[in-house]
Regions:
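Extreme N-terminal leader/targeting segments of oxidoreductases
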Residues: 1-6
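Short hydrophobic core segments
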Residues: 8-11, 34, 140, 157, ...
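N-terminal Rossmann-fold NAD(P) dinucleotide-binding loop
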Residues: 17
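Aromatic pocket-lining residues of Rossmann-like dinucleotide-binding sites
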Residues: 23-24
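Short beta-strand "acidic-cap" motif of Rossmann-like dinucleotide-binding folds
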Residues: 29-36, 40
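Conserved N-terminal/central alpha/beta ligand/cofactor-binding core
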Residues: 42, 48-134, 138-139
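Rossmann-like NAD(P)H-binding beta-loop-alpha module
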Residues: 78, 154-155
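A conserved short coil-to-beta-strand element within the FAD-binding core of flavoproteins
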Residues: 136-153
Length: 176
């Protein structure tokens, strides 16, 4: 980790946020994750209301919520990119959190829509058990900064709870 980095806020609990949090924990940094949408269990009900009631929650829907936009997709894991890191490591982590062992050997790995939300829940639970924080229904509304020696740096974020509209700030050494 960078010298002096102790508090890192991650905006969003999609794949980048979840895997970023796990990586920070490996480096001894406990992340604070803020997510605009709901946890997957509540989000599943909110998404169902799109079809049953015709109502769309602007803060928790197919795009926003724990697990990101793909949490309620078909669960296919496919990339042709080889320059973005170790895809095998990602598959191993998915396996660790509950995916079928076949994703480690299949040419086109597939987790399945029914399993992916449970895997995302397991990832959150592990991050919390290791000291990380999760704040659902919490939208980043601004960045905090200060200027020191003519250089501007981020010092945290301002957030708003999407249900209560309560605002607060979260200080951090870094924001992802």
């Amino acid at each position: 980790p960078a010298d002096g980095v102790k508090r890192v806020v991650i905006v969003g609990s999609g794949p980048a946020g979840l895997f970023g949090a796990l990586r920070l924990l490996e480096d001894g940094i406990t992340p604070i994750i803020v997510e605009r949408g709901e946890y997957t269990d509540a989000r599943k009900k909110t998404i169902a209301e799109i079809s049953t009631k015709g109502s769309v929650d602007g803060d928790s829907n197919y795009c926003f919520g724990e697990g990101g936009a793909g949490a309620f997709s078909d669960g296919k894991l496919y990339t042709r990119s080889t320059k973005r890191g170790d895809a095998g490591r990602i598959l191993f982590l998915f396996r660790f959190f509950g995916a079928s062992e076949s994703i480690l050997t299949d040419a086109h790995p597939h987790i399945g829509t029914d399993k992916l939300p449970k895997i995302v829940n397991a990832m959150r639970e592990k991050i919390i058990s290791l000291g990380g924080e999760f704040h659902s229904c919490t939208k980043c509304v601004d960045f905090l900064s200060e200027t020191e020696n003519g250089k501007k740096r981020i010092t945290g974020i301002a957030v708003e709870h999407t249900k209560t509209k309560e605002r607060r700030t979260i200080e951090a050494d870094a924001v992802l």
